Regions:
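Conserved His + Asp/Glu catalytic blocks
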Residues: 9-21, 26-46, 55-207
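Conserved, mostly hydrophobic/aromatic
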Residues: 51
Length: 207
């Protein structure tokens, strides 16, 4: 399934529900892992090459910064929540597998239809995990502007890990940011803010 086509071309009729169902079902089967699906301009390293990526949680890092943030309700049935005090606009659903997929699919479909931006400008990150102590599945949705993808000028693609709050350094120049004490929490916050799509906040306010 191609999130780019889902956003860009209704004739493709890609099934968002299937993407979310597959991602969340895999997360449900892998409770000690976290998985993500990146769209074009949102961390997909090879154009038109779409796949789920899962990795096992490190014992010394049980939670990522995003997972520790507070989320507030933005709809009347209290199922869709929006992150507070974070450099990116992130929506979250929590619950049993089927409920999460159903609620998220409905809400995101409406989000796409009512967005004031053209569909070819829209992309997204989806991140899913399952609780170690219960059957609660968590799904994050990060709507993105596909031409805003770098945290460091014209380098440093923001994908699933960066959304979670972990910056991946892929070059000597980026590693020097740590070596010379330039990389700190404020620097990371500013970098992630560069790819935040303003329309998402507007949409959250409207909803």
């Amino acid at each position: 399934m191609c999130i780019r086509d889902r956003f860009q071309n209704d004739e493709q009729n890609q099934d968002l529900a299937l993407v979310l169902s597959d991602l969340c079902e895999l997360a449900d089967r892998l409770p000690n892992h976290i998985g993500f699906y990146n769209g074009v301009g949102a961390g997909a390293s090879i154009p038109d090459h779409f796949h789920f990526q899962f990795f096992q949680r490190a014992p010394d890092l049980p939670k990522f910064p995003l997972e520790e943030r507070t989320f507030s309700n933005i709809d009347c049935d209290f199922t869709t929540t929006l992150v507070e005090d974070y450099p990116l606009c992130v929506f979250r659903w929590m619950g049993e597998l089927g409920e999460v997929v159903e609620k998220a699919t409905s809400w995101i479909t409406n989000f796409i239809k009512t967005s004031k931006f053209e569909k070819q400008q829209l992309t997204a990150n989806f991140i899913a995990s399952r609780s170690m102590t219960s059957k609660t599945v968590t799904l994050y949705f990060v709507p993105r502007h596909r031409f805003k993808q770098f945290w460091n000028g014209n380098a440093g693609i923001v994908g699933g890990l960066e959304i979670l709050g972990e910056i991946v350094l892929a070059s000597n120049e980026e590693c020097n940011l740590v070596r010379y004490d330039i990389m700190n929490f404020e620097f990371i916050e500013q970098g992630l803010s560069r790819i935040s799509a303003p329309f998402t906040t507007d949409k959250a306010d409207e909803l």
